[in-house]
Amino acid sequence: MSLHFNSIGFLLVVLALLGVLGNNSSITISATVLLLMQQTFLSKYIPVMEKYGLNIGVIILTIGVLSPIVAGKVKIPALTELLHWKMFLSLVVGMLVAWLAGRGVSLMGSQPVLLTGLLIGTILGVGLLGGIPVGPLIAAGILSLLLGKV
């Protein structure tokens, strides 16, 4: 019996451990699910996840963001509130973040190796700086601006 080192499996284990240490359940769960998929009969579904996973994730995230509105916990602002400078600024920032996330998706598609650094940076930001793990796409968008890519 020969042992074979699986670098992708090792990376997934490291990401899962960093997720645990950084209290980042989304990284921990994602890395663990992908590791289980890679090591079992579920590996045949990895191309499906690769092709549709990001879109499915964005749909689920959008449902989560819209749910408080549908539940009546967040009210739709009146027209006069839409004209307030803070509301205008929030619209501009929302558009900027969406644009950055779009650049991030393009960069991650063209240079997926950078995703590892972004994920580790996100985990370190959560663990060391008390941040919240919401921004790999936006981080990739900012990185694309810094690199002058996409």
UniProtKB/Swiss-Prot annotation:
This is UPF0756 membrane protein Asuc_1151. InterPro entries: UPF0756_TM (IPR007382). It comes from Actinobacillus succinogenes (strain ATCC 55618 / DSM 22257 / CCUG 43843 / 130Z). PANTHER family: UPF0756 MEMBRANE PROTEIN YEAL. GO terms for cellular component: plasma membrane. The keyword rRNA-binding does not apply. HAMAP family: UPF0756 (MF_01874). The lineage of its organism: Bacteria, Pseudomonadati, Pseudomonadota, Gammaproteobacteria, Pasteurellales. The keyword Membrane applies. Keywords: Cell membrane, Membrane, Transmembrane, Transmembrane helix.
